[in-house]
């Protein structure tokens, strides 16, 4: 996203008009190659790893940032709702859809993105270039063939099925299926949802069915991709009793089936370092 389309959260009021003006300029003079479908994206990092993704539209009717609501597209973290209104001011009246949102698909069999990657030489390349500040290289190809689009949609349907969910997550506390999880940009997607909910109040059911604001731009990546590295977030606790903390963590983990403490099937062991 060009820096002219980015605003600081601290001084967003001062930059809204400039952002909207820059969007108008880009819409008229830069973004002239339309794609009727998806865009297959490859980002080559400095390490040589290639992150593959599909850029498309997320149906906001299938997403909610409110805890407990049934939806097939869900956030991976709690949403701080106070961060939504400033973003709504930028999105309201914007002529371009330019959020940075990464969705994650739990696709160990590589049925969604990788088959498209294997056929990229058949696709029309729509952009390519170097990214700033050592960000690597990026290229995008248009996925417009109806057969390939149907293939993507079918893969998403299977990934979001109840059968697939039950097979992957037999110990999950909530049983409604999950198609995509928000990996990054949760508050941007939440803002799109909030804007859509406000706008939908002014529309007839027929208008709401196909209104452009119902969808939000996002990139979908496979969480099993070798280029997706999920780093731990370390926490330091001061002036606590190590044994008490350990017991509390084990109790919480077992009660929530989090699998983050100890036991034969626990997948995320951790270390408590401190005086014993």
List each model region and its residues.
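Single conserved hydrophobic/aromatic residue that forms the stacking wall/gate
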Residues: 1-11
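Compositional signal for N-terminal targeting/processing segments
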Residues: 9, 17, 138-147, 159-167, ...
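Short conserved micro-motifs at the rims of enzyme active sites and ligand-binding pockets
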Residues: 14, 114-116, 228-233
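Short alpha-helix boundary/capping and kink motifs at helix termini
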Residues: 22-181
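Glycine-rich, charged/polar anion/phosphate-binding loops
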Residues: 85-89, 203-204, 255-259, 266
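Residues that flank catalytic or metal-binding motifs in active/ligand-binding sites
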Residues: 99, 214-216, 268
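Catalytic or ion-translocation cores adjacent to nucleophile or general acid/base/metal-coordination motifs
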Residues: 184-251
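C-terminal catalytic or substrate-handling cores of phosphate/nucleotide-
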Residues: 237-276
């Amino acid at each position: 996203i060009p820096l002219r389309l980015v605003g600081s959260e601290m001084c967003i009021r001062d930059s809204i008009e400039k952002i909207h003006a820059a969007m108008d300029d880009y819409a008229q003079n830069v973004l002239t190659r339309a794609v009727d479908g998806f865009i297959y994206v490859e980002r080559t990092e400095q390490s040589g790893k290639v992150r593959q993704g599909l850029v498309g539209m997320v149906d906001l009717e299938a997403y909610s940032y409110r805890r407990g609501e049934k939806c097939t597209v869900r956030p991976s973290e709690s949403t701080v709702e106070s961060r939504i209104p400033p973003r709504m001011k930028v999105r309201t009246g914007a002529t371009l859809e330019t959020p940075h949102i990464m969705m994650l698909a739990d696709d160990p069999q590589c049925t969604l993105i990788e088959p498209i990657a294997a056929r990229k030489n058949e696709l029309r390349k729509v952009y390519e270039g170097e990214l700033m500040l050592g960000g690597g290289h990026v290229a995008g190809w248009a996925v417009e063939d109806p057969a390939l689009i149907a293939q993507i949609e079918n893969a998403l349907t299977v990934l979001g099925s109840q059968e697939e969910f039950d097979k992957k997550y037999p110990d999950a506390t909530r049983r409604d299926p999950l198609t995509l999880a928000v990996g990054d940009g949760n508050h941007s997607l939440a803002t799109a949802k909030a804007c859509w909910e406000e706008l939908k109040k002014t529309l007839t059911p027929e208008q709401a069915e196909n209104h452009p604001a119902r969808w939000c731009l996002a990139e979908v990546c496979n969480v099993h991709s070798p280029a997706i590295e999920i780093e731990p977030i370390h926490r330091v606790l001061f002036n606590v009793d190590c044994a008490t903390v350990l017991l509390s963590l084990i109790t919480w983990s077992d009660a929530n089936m989090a699998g983050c403490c100890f036991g034969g099937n626990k997948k995320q062991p951790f270390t408590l370092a401190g005086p014993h």
